[in-house]
Amino acid sequence: MADFDMVLKCWGPVEADHATHGSLVLTRLFTEHPETLKLFPKFAGIAHGDLAGDAGVSAHGATVLKKLGDLLKARGGHAALLKPLSSSHATKHKIPIINFTLIAEVIGKVMEEKAGLDAAGQTALRNVMAIIITDMEADYKELGFTE
């Protein structure tokens, strides 16, 4: 619970502008981990240099951060919120679980730079994301997706 609260203390700037922060997160994810771009077929034709200014990238990044905000605000009681996300990411999008660890690290970096998430907050975010990702992984296994 304390970890969730620590992350939420710095969530305000992210929540105030999901689109900008979401664009930063996805653009950095695609830059630091280029292989992840293949998981987003709708962005395939976008030149790398154009990703940051693309409305679709920004909109998807906003969706990611809004969902994460909902999960954070649930403070661990996120099973009902997480199940449909796990299901769509396992069965429809086929996203390997490791990618959630990659994006979590990128979110931490963006929050450090743009929302003042300090070292303790970074640790709290890693702890929170470990809980969420472990729960997603259990959902994935239940669905038979073990990639």
Curated annotation (Swiss-Prot):
SUPFAM superfamilies: Globin-like. InterPro entries: Globin, Globin-like_sf, Myoglobin. GO terms for biological process: removal of superoxide radicals. Its main location: cytoplasm. Heme b binds at residue 89. Pfam families: Globin (PF00042). Residues 2-141 form the Globin domain. It is an enzyme of class 1 (oxidoreductase). It catalyses: Fe(III)-heme b-[protein] + nitric oxide + H2O = Fe(II)-heme b-[protein] + nitrite + 2 H(+); H2O2 + AH2 = A + 2 H2O. Monomeric heme protein which primary function is to store oxygen and facilitate its diffusion within muscle tissues. Reversibly binds oxygen through a pentacoordinated heme iron and enables its timely and efficient release as needed during periods of heightened demand. Depending on the oxidative conditions of tissues and cells, and in addition to its ability to bind oxygen, it also has a nitrite reductase activity whereby it regulates the production of bioactive nitric oxide. Its EC number is 1.7.-.-, 1.11.1.-. Nitrite binds at residue 60. GO terms for molecular function: heme binding; metal ion binding; nitrite reductase activity; oxygen binding; oxygen carrier activity; peroxidase activity. It is found in: Cytoplasm, Sarcoplasm. Belongs to the globin family. The gene is mb. This is Myoglobin. PANTHER family: MYOGLOBIN. Monomeric. Keywords: Cytoplasm, Heme, Iron, Metal-binding, Muscle protein, Oxidoreductase, Oxygen transport, Transport. O2 binds at residue 60. It comes from the Eukaryota. GO terms for cellular component: extracellular exosome; sarcoplasm.
